[in-house]
Curated annotation (Swiss-Prot):
One of its GO terms (biological process) is proteolysis. Glycans are attached at residues 35, 136, 150, 343. Binds 2 Zn(2+) ions per subunit. It comes from the Eukaryota. This is Probable carboxypeptidase BDBG_01803. SUPFAM superfamilies: Bacterial exopeptidase dimerisation domain, Zn-dependent exopeptidases. Its cofactor is Zn(2+). Transmembrane segments: none annotated. The keyword Zinc applies. It comes from Blastomyces gilchristii (strain SLH14081) (Blastomyces dermatitidis). GO terms for molecular function: metal ion binding; peptidase activity.
Length: 434
């Protein structure tokens, strides 16, 4: 082979997968982030830029610590130390490890408030756990001309939700410098990614008083620096089918559980597209259609055995109505599709189900956004029924959910810094409430 031909062949082999990688990333993130690594501009030290910033260095510190759900103790210790060094009184709220995990870590929620102010009227809260696997923190210079704001920070938790944690802390510290008695508290919870155990624990604790001592809750999640006016509800259920096993050559001697469950799943799969009057799940102008995801399907032992059991798990994102109404619609749909078969069982094991959550947006200067993902917000019961002052709930944060939980999770320095301004604006509005 001629040298020129060899060079061309090698070039094609190298370029093709790279091009495919760019295309995939562009589709996944809709142009939000590019999966590229460009050398930094001359004389620009990315690590030094981070080290010179209180915000960026705090964010790096907590993102470099692995804190997959049920293993949050180390990042909790780092936050306790940092907040204690910056005039916060800190408390650990021990949270038992989830039953299905064998971790021996003593993990806990971090509750912090300015010294002498144990009952702050404003609470900023986010979560310190992440989904697996841990991905190392890394810095990536922008394409083309160097712009500090366009440095990309990648790694697990850099967006969801340690960006919110870091920005909240700095926003609170900035207010404390100007007004040491600002009534702001910080609550960083564990296990948001595993059902909200941390927030449920706080909700059930003596800190969640009736009536509340706080009048404003500011939640942190990736919202693209927009103020969220609400998110869909959440409901989960399982479908199980029973059959009778037999040799596949003589199927009439048995009864297929998979044949039982298939028409039921087909009916379930379309409930979000069917009008309510025809037996479907509700939609709304604000949240759009209710969506269903058949996340797992299991059944059978082998291809030559009539299956004696089958099951499926389903997640529902509710766009309107109550959990109870949705469950009734699902029950009727399953009964209709199965012909009332006693071989089909429907189970609603999730006692954490909730309807759509409407949030406050009465602070000027923000774009508004409605999101489909769930949060810890419905896990915190607010006991303000008999209070003259109703608790306001805001949801805001840097980064986009489109990259959260993915291999390219990340955000820009500019977005992280703008989040401090956004949280400060929300704190200012809350302070004016008294």
């Amino acid at each position: 082979m001629k040298l020129s031909h060899l060079a061309a062949a090698l070039s094609a082999q190298l370029v093709a997968p790279v091009a495919a990688g760019y295309l995939r990333q562009d589709i996944l993130t809709a142009g939000t982030l590019r999966n590229t690594t460009v050398p930094a501009a001359p004389n620009e030290d990315l690590n030094q830029i981070v080290s010179d910033s209180q915000l960026l260095s705090l964010h790096r510190t907590i993102c470099e610590i692995e804190s997959v759900s049920n293993h949050e103790s180390t990042v909790g210790e780092a936050l306790i130390k940092y907040l204690g060094e910056h005039d916060f009184t800190t408390e650990k709220q021990i949270v038992p490890v989830d039953e299905d995990d064998d971790s021996t870590d003593e993990r806990y929620n971090v509750w912090a408030y300015p010294k002498g102010s144990p009952k702050p009227k404003i609470i900023l809260t986010s979560h310190i756990d992440t989904v697996p696997p841990h991905i190392n923190y890394s810095l990536h210079a922008p394409e083309g001309d160097f712009d500090r704001a366009n440095i990309t920070i990648k790694g697990r938790g850099t967006v969801d939700a340690k960006a919110s944690v870091a920005a909240m802390i700095i926003a609170a510290l900035d207010h404390m410098k100007e007004s040491p008695d600002v009534p702001v508290g910080l609550l960083f919870v564990v296990s948001e990614e595993r059902g909200g155990t941390g927030m449920i624990h706080f909700s059930d604790s003596e800190l969640n008083t009736s009536p509340p001592f706080f009048h404003t809750l500011i939640f942190g999640e990736p919202t693209e620096l927009k103020l969220v006016d609400g998110h869909k509800g959440n409901l989960r259920f399982d479908v199980e089918a029973k059959g009778v096993s037999a040799h596949s050559g003589y199927p009439w001697l048995g009864h297929s559980a998979i044949s039982e469950i298939l028409p039921v799943l087909a009916r379930i799969d379309g409930l979000g597209d069917i009008p309510v009057e025809d037996g479907g799940l509700p939609s709304s102008e604000k949240y759009g259609s209710t969506t269903l995801n058949i996340g797992t399907v299991r059944g059978g032992a082998a291809g030559n055995v009539v299956p004696e059991s089958a099951s499926a798990s389903v997640a529902v994102r509710l766009a309107d109505g109550t959990v109870e109404d949705a469950q009734d619609i699902i029950r009727k749909a399953v009964a209709d599709a199965s012909g009332g078969s006693k071989n089909i069982t429907l189970k609603f094991p999730d006692d954490k189900a909730y309807p759509p959550i409407d949030l406050d947006t009465d602070v000027d200067g923000f774009e508004l956004l409605t999101v489909n993902y769930g949060t810890d917000i419905p896990k915190l019961d607010i006991h303000d029924e008999d209070s003259d002052v109703k608790v306001k709930r805001y949801l805001y944060g840097p980064g986009t959910i489109l990259v959260a939980h993915g291999v390219d999770e990340g955000l820009t320095v500019g977005d992280l810094e703008k989040a401090v301004e956004g949280y400060s604006k929300l704190i200012d509005a809350a302070v004016k409430r008294g």
